């Protein structure tokens, strides 16, 4: 049921998606050029091309909550994001540390979903990288870095799905160094 809600919200919100400029390459060509044998690279490249993702958390009221979020960076197979300590989403993720992200392309009828367990970090080098990766974060919280907290995902599962006959449907379990250490 929760997966259906996320997919429906993803499809509903696709009109509001922001895409970075790639005038020399169609979106279909971009997708065709992905290395589908490497799920991590698919996720990273899609999230970089479509910098605004929609993330779903389990709300404090027990209902799904969806909001725009921004992938920050990948390092050594680990996907990093951030939030702000006074946001409701931070409290939700503390109470229920799982998130699902979705980004969609209406033109090719293609989407990427990613889910995983949220692990917070106060490592200043990670938070600094989040600021480096995001002009929005810097403009909003550059003078208040103390309220920003980083997080990375473990137990990551990703799916690339398309209604286009020219693209595959694939899913991956993306283990990283923190999964292996557990």
How does the language model describe each region?
Residues 24-54:
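Active-site-proximal "nucleotidyltransferase
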Residues 24-35, 113-182:
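Charged, gly/pro-rich active-site loop segments
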Residues 17-25:
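Sec-dependent signal peptide cleavage junction
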Residues 45-60, 99-103:
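A short, Trp-centered hydrophobic/proline-enriched beta-strand micro-motif
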Residues 72-109:
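A short mixed-secondary-structure module that forms the rim of ligand-binding clefts
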Residues 54, 79-80, 159:
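General beta-strand recognition
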Residues 1-4:
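Positively charged n-region of N-terminal signal peptides that target proteins for export
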Residues 9-17:
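Hydrophobic core
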